[in-house]
Each structure stands twice: as C-alpha cells, then as structure tokens.
C-alpha cells in the first residue's frame, strides 16, 4: 500500500525534508509526526478508493461524481480513483461486437426510444450473457486490482458485483468491497445483492430487508437516509416570493399559476409529447435532456395555440433551480428523479406498467407507501391526476409527506466508508 500523509494533516512543509543532512531529515520527520499527533490525536493515511461506475442511464456516474465531490470537499483520507467499468470490459462487450454499440449505449437507446416493453425478459437475457463471460470479467478485473492495489472498492453498478467481488478476493484478499445501491430496492436475482462477503449501503428499509434476507450480517448492511443527490440540491438558497415570481416570468410563466416539471431522465422520452398534449391548460417546464429530436418536436407542437405557456429545455445542470420554480413533478419512477423531486418538496406523478423498467417498479410502491404522490397505470390519465393533485387539501397532504423525508445520504456515506476502511463499528 502506498501510504501518504493526508493533505489536511500537513503541518510542516515537506520540502524541508529535502535536506542533505540525513540525521536532520530524520529529526524533521519525527517532529512532523509528533506535531500532527499532538494537534489531531492521530495521523490519517490516504487510502486508494476505487469508485466503480458506468454510464447506463446516467444515474451511476452522477452518484459517483456527487460522492467524490463531497469526499474531496471534506478532505476525507481517500485517493479517489473513478473507474468506468464499461471501458475496462470493452474488449469483451458482446453487444458491441454484434451491434457496434456498447452495452451502456444499447441501454440508453432503449430509454430514448421507449423500447422498454419486455425489459424483464431482456434483463434475463443480459444476465445470461454476463454469466457466460463471467470468468473473463474476473480475469480483467483481477489484473486491474493487481495493478492499482486499492484499499477500498466502492461499486455503484448493478449486475457485475459478483465478478467485482470474486476478482477482488483473488487479487487483494481482505480488501473491503462496498456496493451502494442507487436504486431504492434490489431487483433479484443477481442485480445488486449477491451472496458474497462484502458491505452494502442501502437507501431504504426495503433494500436493507432484502440484503438481510440474503444472509448478510446486520453490521455489513448499512442504512443511508435515501439516494445519493448532487450536493447542489443542498446548496440552493431559498427563493423569496418576489424572486421566485421574477424567475418564473423570465421563463415566460405566470407566477400565480401552478407549474409542473416534466422530466424523463437524461434521454427524455417520447411520452412527453403526449403529456404536453393532454395538459393544454397547465404551465409546464419540459426537460428533454440530450434528445434533440424530441426537443424539436415539442417546440413545433407548442407553437400551436395553448391555454397555458410552456418552457422547453434540453440537457441542463440546472435541475435544482427548475425544481425550485415548479410545484409538482411528472416523470418515470426513476430513483434519482423521484428522490430529487421529493427533496425539493414536489409531489410526484409517475407511471408504472409493463413498459416500466423492472428495477424501477418498486419505486412506484415506495411513492404510494410514503404518500408523496400519485401512481398511474399510464399517462393517458395525467390530466385527471394533475387536477386531483392540485386540490388544496390533497396537495397539502402530499407536501407534508415530502417534508417527512430527510435525505442526507451523500453526506452520510463518506463517514460510513471511512469507518469500513478503519474497521470500526459501522452498525
């Protein structure tokens, strides 16, 4: 293990140790450690942390980035190295060999086109392919671990945790593996939770129950208060009444009329056209993500007479700001979007049906259980749902339910990782 002194423990300039006098150099090293211990009580050594993610859907990279940002701001004693699993496994990507597209690109294309009917069967097929190439995955990962020599591996990806765990036990026995679920619950088998020695960080009671039900000890199943959100959500200054009204006017919206935020992830979704058609008398902020074709179609459609204005946006990093200007959320039951909306106190309207990704179906159950919104069979019912949600008593109840959710997972997880690394009690 390459041991360094953490930056925030550097009380003596290390350049002073570049002296020709070896004895003086040794005395300065001793002085450095004595001073650090006297001031901090301990020396924190920087440990190499491999943060495993990929770009299927975008939420995994976003969670990894948010976690890294917070740990670096807090000067946690980790040398954080993001690792894109797709890039490591590119040489054996059977989907790329057959179609010219990476596995993550196939997934993103499905989301963009709405080709999600039958996705449970597709996932079963994907698991068969993953198992078929399991040994090769393990060899590639094992070589990577031997080269980079991590002190802690943190996985933010599903499907591949068995290969990650097996390869790590071979290359670096005793190195902890922590899987952070970026879904509200697991979708067994072989999605997030595997039967192998490791830690899990779960953002819901349901996920904790699933991990414990798989035989994992209580001290290996750690509870965070929700999904990982960007720290920007916590940094947004509240808007005053006049400030919020002015910001709405700048988007061409009426400050005195409710606004719905329509968001279907980074790729958008064609169903947004249908939602906009069915809500001609509702003000909407429509976020299209990277889907330029969808944006063009929405802009063309909204040039037709409407009884209420809309604002159309492409890919943006200003989701927290747009959520501040909205009163409710409409979208798919993705764990990230739901969690962001609830954090911003927006009641949600989501759908759940045969087209819903299987790993996202429990999220609709969670919405109902927590009382934070309305779940539809399909968005043909969206007009009635918006009318129901905006009834004063109903809206107040949903808002109160969102306020009961106190999600600070992105700040809790670094402490949990540090305790795992230190071998201290994390239960």
Where in the sequence are the language-model features?
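A nucleotide-sugar donor-handling region in carbohydrate enzymes
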Residues: 198-264
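Short hydrophobic beta-strand element within catalytic cores of glycosyltransferases
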Residues: 329-331, 347-357
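Donor-nucleotide binding loops and adjacent catalytic segments primarily
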Residues: 243-325
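Active-site and donor-binding regions of nucleotide-sugar-utilizing enzymes
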Residues: 113-215, 220
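Conserved N-terminal ligand/cofactor-binding loop architecture of enzyme catalytic domains
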Residues: 66-144
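C-terminal alpha-helical cap of glycosyltransferases
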Residues: 407-427
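Acidic donor-binding loop of glycosyltransferase active sites
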Residues: 324-337
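A short, well-ordered alpha-helix in the C-terminal region of glycosyltransferases
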Residues: 394-408
């Amino acid at each position: 293990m390459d041991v360094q002194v953490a930056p925030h423990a550097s009380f003596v300039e290390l350049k002073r140790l570049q002296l020709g006098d070896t004895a003086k150099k040794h005395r300065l090293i001793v002085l450095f450690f004595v001073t650090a211990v006297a001031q901090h009580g301990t020396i924190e050594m920087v440990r190499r942390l491999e943060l495993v993610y990929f770009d299927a859907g975008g939420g995994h990279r976003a969670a990894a980035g948010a976690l890294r940002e917070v740990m670096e701001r807090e000067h946690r004693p980790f040398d954080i190295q993001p690792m894109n699993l797709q890039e490591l496994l590119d040489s054996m990507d059977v989907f790329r060999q057959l179609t010219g597209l990476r596995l993550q690109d196939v997934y993103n294309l499905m989301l963009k086109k709405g080709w999600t009917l039958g996705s449970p069967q597709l996932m079963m097929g994907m698991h068969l392919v993953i198992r078929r190439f399991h040994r090769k995955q393990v060899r590639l990962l094992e070589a990577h671990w031997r080269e980079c020599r991590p002190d802690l591996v943190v996985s933010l990806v599903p499907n591949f945790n068995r290969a990650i765990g097996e390869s790590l036990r071979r290359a670096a026995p005793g190195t902890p593996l922590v899987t952070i679920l970026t879904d509200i619950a697991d979708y067994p088998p072989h999605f997030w939770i595997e039967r192998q020695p490791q830690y899990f960080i779960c953002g819901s009671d349901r996920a904790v129950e699933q991990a414990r039900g798989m035989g994992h000890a209580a001290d290996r199943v750690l509870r965070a208060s929700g999904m990982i959100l960007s720290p920007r959500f916590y940094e947004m200054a509240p808007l005053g009444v006049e400030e919020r009204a002015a910001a709405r006017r700048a988007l061409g919206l009426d400050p005195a009329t409710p606004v719905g935020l329509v968001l279907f992830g980074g790729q958008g979704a064609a169903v947004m056209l249908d939602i906009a058609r069915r809500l001609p008398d509702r003000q909407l902020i429509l976020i299209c993500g990277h889907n330029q074709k969808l944006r063009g179609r929405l802009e063309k459609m909204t040039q037709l007479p409407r009884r209420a204005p809309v604002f159309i946006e492409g890919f943006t990093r200003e989701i927290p700001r747009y959520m501040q200007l909205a009163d409710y959320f409409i979208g798919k039951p993705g764990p990230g979007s739901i969690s962001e909306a609830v954090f911003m106190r927006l009641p949600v309207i989501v759908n759940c049906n045969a087209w819903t990704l299987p790993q996202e179906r429990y999220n609709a159950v969670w919405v109902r259980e927590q009382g934070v919104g309305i779940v539809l069979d399909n968005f043909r019912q969206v007009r009635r749902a918006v009318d129901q949600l905006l009834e004063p008593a109903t809206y107040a109840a949903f808002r109160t339910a969102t306020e009961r959710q106190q999600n600070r997972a992105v700040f809790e997880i670094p402490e949990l990782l540090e305790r795992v690394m230190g071998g201290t009690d994390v239960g």
